[in-house]
């Protein structure tokens, strides 16, 4: 989730379930809008290197970050993937996706383990909020 967000379709042709899914997607985008539009953007990996692709939006005050990851096609016995956020306050504590807490230093140097998926091109997001 980055940049502009919208749909090019006729919503009158959608089912009730599809409209509900769209509402949920729009609500999620609005939740992160400020950090996506006004935050600092970092590429965390090289998208052309063949591995996972990751990028990050960070608020100017380092109080919030959104890390986005897209995994490559699944390989048998692939190594565990880790993504390393940037621009965090190393001394601050951050809540990851509203659950666990880690310091900025632990996140930047220890990284975030990327969930292993059984499908190609799966995406994951990590919402980091300073507490």
Regions found by a protein language model. Give the residues of each.
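Active-site-proximal substrate-binding groove within the catalytic cores of carbohydrate-active enzymes
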Residues: 1-100, 104
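C-terminal beta-strand-rich structural cap/linker in extracellular carbohydrate-active enzymes
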Residues: 104-131
């Amino acid at each position: 989730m980055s940049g502009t967000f919208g749909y090019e379709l006729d919503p009158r042709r959608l089912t009730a379930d599809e409209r509900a899914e769209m509402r949920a997607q729009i609500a999620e985008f609005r939740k992160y809008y400020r950090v996506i539009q006004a935050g600092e953007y970092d590429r965390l990996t090289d998208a052309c290197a063949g591995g996972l692709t990751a990028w990050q939006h960070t608020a100017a005050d380092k109080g919030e970050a959104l890390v986005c990851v897209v995994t490559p096609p699944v390989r048998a016995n692939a190594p565990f993937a880790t993504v390393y956020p940037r621009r965090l306050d190393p001394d601050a504590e951050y809540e990851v996706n509203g659950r666990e807490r880690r310091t900025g230093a632990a996140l930047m140097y220890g990284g975030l383990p990327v969930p292993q998926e059984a499908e190609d091109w799966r995406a994951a997001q990590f919402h980091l909020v300073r507490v």
